Each structure stands twice: as C-alpha cells, then as structure tokens.
C-alpha cells in the first residue's frame, strides 16, 4: 500500500461495532502503522440504583483517564459512534466519524438525540458509513460521506461447532444467520423455515440462534428450527462454515453475518434492496448471493425454493464468493477506503 509523507501512522479508534475498528487497526498495523482501539465504556450492571451510580462514575473516570492517555499518544481520533459525542467531545479535537446504523438510521429522528447526532456528523472532518441503507439518512447533512463496506475477518480460526455438540449430529443443515427480529425480517424467515421444513428431507436440519424477539423465537421453533445459544465469534463462524446453505436477513442489506457466510463460500440466500444496491459503489454491483435485487423480501416461498436450489447445486458449479469478499470486504480494502477518506478531507 502506498505511503504518503506522514500517512496516519497513529490513529486512535473509539468504539468497535462489528469489530470494524479491530480489523482496521490490524490491517493498519500490518503496514507498520500503530493504530489502537479503545472500546467505549459500558454502563455497569448492579442490583440497586446507588451501586449503579457509583459504578458508572468510577468506570467513567477510569475510562476517561485511559482515553486521555491514549489521545496524547495518538491525537487523531476515529469515532465509531455519534451517540458517544457528549462523553468524548471534551477531548476529540479534529476527528473522523464512522456510522454503523442505529445512531444515524434511528436516533437522528428522535427529538432527544437529533441535536447530538447532528453535531457529531456536521463537526467531523470526514464521515464514513458502513452499509448502503445509511446513505439516505446522511445526504442532507454530509452528501460527501463515504461508504466503507463492512470488513470481514478472512482468517477466522476453526472452532468447535456447538450445534453438532448440542444435536449430537454431524448431519447437513441450513443456518439462519440473523437474529429473529422484525427489523431483520424475522416473520419472513419464520415462514421460509416452514416452507423448507415441509420440503426438506428430515436428515437436513434447520438451525438458528436463540436470539431475538421471544414470539418469533417460539414461532421459529414451532417451524422446526433448532435454536442454539448466541455464540462467540469463532464458534459462530464455525457454524456458518459447516452449513450446507445460509439464509440471511430479509431487510435488504448484507450485515457482517451474511458477509461471513460469503467469506466461507457457503451459498447465501438473501434479498437486496435495489435502491441501495446500485452503481454508487463497486461493492454494490453483482453481489454473489442467491436472490439479490430480484428477490422480494416478503416472498418466503421463493426464499425456500432458492435454498433448495442451492442445496442441489454441486459445489463446483456454485459462484465463488470468498474472492468477492476479499476484493470488497477485506480489512485491507476497508483500510484503503479509510485512508483515501482521510486524505480527501485533508485530515
């Protein structure tokens, strides 16, 4: 990767949604830079209000001390949450902002948070966003904001598959990669599971995470989905790696979970919103999923049919997907985009 005279040798990342900051820092450090990630402080869990208040004050003071020390060594700050502005604004200085979802998609429209989000977005030297659906929420405030496609770890180690351990089976299965919530298209996923269970041989299991809305979780189980606990990264990735096919969320975008399936060359059935997956960025064109922009996100029947087709297609005839992830969603690709954004902003 080309290097300029200064070239952002030291950058401090605040927050780490979807491990984006960790993957960016790892890629940067492999080039000889010295980037660091400082997770944002979390509110302590305690049984009573007094303990929570004391714990919050102590943790806040501890975190701010670490933040200040880290900033002295790395004055350039890449902030991964607009909501965090009141807690870090006192020391930010000139910063880059990276938006990952809820803050710009939802919070900006809530009166209690609109001003906070506006200040964070408009005062940043450069603004990045992680998924194409966020663009429409940013264009009025920062039309020049840059898409940095979600990076995916391409070197995730092998791990124990907890589904195989729980089910005491090494048989074939279809994995629903997303949590069971309406915002992820949970109702359509349940209906697709029903269609699949009615058509699949009983030797092929349906597997999903015990994560999401309780009513949808119950419905998924009734549809024949074996639910396994929410998993740490390597185990979750192993469940994806061992799947015969994966069904993604039906919200019209690819999040980290869907991209991890593509990184493992596992067939992914997912609808993509054509308003978002356009020609505005190379990563949004010819996405190698089953369905894509031609698939109606409410069409559970077609989702099931595509899943069956993927299962019946020999591996040698499936489109390779890992190479596409390497090209557009690798940590190196994300780092290249971020550095270009820094330079374009004169940061």
Where are these regions (language model features)?
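Nucleotide-activated donor-binding/catalytic signature segment of Leloir-type glycosyltransferases, i.e.
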Residues: 215-234, 242-245
């Amino acid at each position: 990767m080309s290097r300029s005279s200064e070239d952002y040798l030291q950058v401090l990342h605040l927050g780490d949604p979807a491990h984006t900051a960790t993957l960016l820092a790892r890629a940067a450090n492999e080039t000889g830079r010295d980037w660091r990630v400082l997770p944002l402080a979390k509110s302590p869990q305690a049984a009573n209000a007094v303990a929570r208040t004391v714990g919050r004050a102590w943790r806040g003071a501890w975190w701010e001390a670490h933040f200040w020390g880290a900033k002295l060594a790395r004055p350039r700050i890449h902030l991964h949450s607009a909501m965090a502005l009141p807690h870090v604004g006192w020391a930010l200085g000139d910063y880059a902002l990276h938006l990952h979802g809820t803050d710009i998609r939802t919070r900006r429209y809530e009166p209690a948070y609109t001003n906070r989000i506006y200040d964070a977005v408009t005062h940043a030297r450069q603004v990045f966003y992680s998924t194409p659906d966020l663009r429409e929420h940013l264009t009025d405030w920062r039309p020049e904001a840059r898409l940095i496609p979600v990076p995916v770890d391409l070197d995730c180690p092998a791990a124990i598959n907890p589904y195989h351990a729980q089910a005491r089976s090494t048989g074939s299965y279809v994995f629903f990669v997303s949590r069971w919530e309406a915002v992820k298209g949970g109702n359509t996923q349940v209906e697709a599971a029903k269609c699949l269970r009615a058509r699949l041989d009983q030797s092929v299991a349906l597997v999903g995470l015990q994560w999401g809305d309780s009513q949808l979780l119950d419905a998924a189980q009734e549809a024949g989905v074996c639910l396994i606990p929410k998993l740490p990264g390597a185990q979750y990735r192993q469940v994806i790696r061992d799947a015969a096919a994966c069904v993604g969320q039906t919200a019209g975008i690819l999040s980290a979970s869907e991209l991890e399936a593509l990184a493992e060359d596992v067939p992914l059935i997912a609808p993509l919103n054509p308003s978002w997956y356009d020609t505005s960025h190379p990563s949004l064109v010819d996405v190698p999923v089953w369905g894509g922009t031609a698939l109606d996100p409410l069409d559970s029947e077609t989702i099931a049919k595509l899943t069956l087709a993927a299962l019946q297609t020999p591996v040698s005839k499936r489109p390779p997907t890992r190479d596409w992830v390497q090209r557009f969603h690798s940590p190196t690709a994300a780092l290249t985009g971020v550095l270009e954004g820094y330079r374009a902003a004169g940061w």
